[in-house]
């Protein structure tokens, strides 16, 4: 990705966060965080990564609502960012947050499973 595409992506991320939180009134849209926007080098397409607070059903409903509002969102972006052509937007759920919390949970589980074994060996448990 070139420098211009990166800058446009960062600006779109800021504007999308504002549009989704303040301008969209669809009740299906839950608590959404725009985690990343990747714009192609020719500025024709933008992949928007979002994280949604809630279960799979909430994520699915939010994604459907965002897909339905895609035209409105794109026109808002076009008004806020001066580009010859506003990139086509594709929404995608960002799994990295969920993956990270799962890894953290597994580490905690392994750590708590380890502590009783150390105490049984006669070693003091310092932490």
From Swiss-Prot:
Alphabetically ordered keywords of this record: Cytoplasm, Ribosome biogenesis
One BP annotation, GO: maturation of SSU-rRNA
Keyword Cytoplasm recorded: yes
Gene Ontology cellular-component terms listed: cytosol
InterPro entries per record: KH_dom-like_a/b, RbfA, RbfA_dom_sf, Ribosome-bd_factorA_CS
Location(s) in or outside the cell: Cytoplasm
Pfam assignment, any one: RBFA
Molecular functions per Gene Ontology: ribosomal small subunit binding
PROSITE patterns, per database record: RBFA
Membrane-spanning intervals of the chain: none
SUPFAM superfamilies the UniProt entry points to: Ribosome-binding factor A, RbfA
Family the UniProt entry places it in: Belongs to the RbfA family.
Subunit structure: Monomer. Binds 30S ribosomal subunits, but not 50S ribosomal subunits or 70S ribosomes.
Described purpose of this protein according to its UniProt entry: One of several proteins that assist in the late maturation steps of the functional core of the 30S ribosomal subunit. Associates with free 30S ribosomal subunits (but not with 30S subunits that are part of 70S ribosomes or polysomes). Required for efficient processing of 16S rRNA. May interact with the 5'-terminal helix region of 16S rRNA.
Protein name in UniProt: Ribosome-binding factor A
Organism listed in the record: Geobacillus kaustophilus (strain HTA426)
């Amino acid at each position: 990705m070139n420098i211009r595409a990166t800058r446009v992506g960062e600006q779109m991320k800021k504007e999308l966060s504002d549009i989704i939180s303040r301008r969209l009134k669809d009740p299906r849209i839950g608590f959404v965080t725009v985690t990343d926007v990747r714009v192609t080098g020719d500025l024709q397409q933008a992949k928007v990564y979002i994280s949604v607070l809630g279960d799979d059903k909430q994520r699915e409903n939010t994604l459907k609502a965002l897909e339905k509002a895609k035209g409105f969102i794109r026109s808002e972006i076009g008004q806020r960012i001066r580009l010859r052509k506003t990139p086509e937007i594709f929404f995608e759920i960002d799994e990295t947050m969920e993956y990270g919390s799962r890894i953290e949970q597994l580490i905690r589980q392994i750590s708590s499973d380890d502590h009783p074994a150390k105490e049984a060996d006669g070693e003091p448990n310092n932490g």
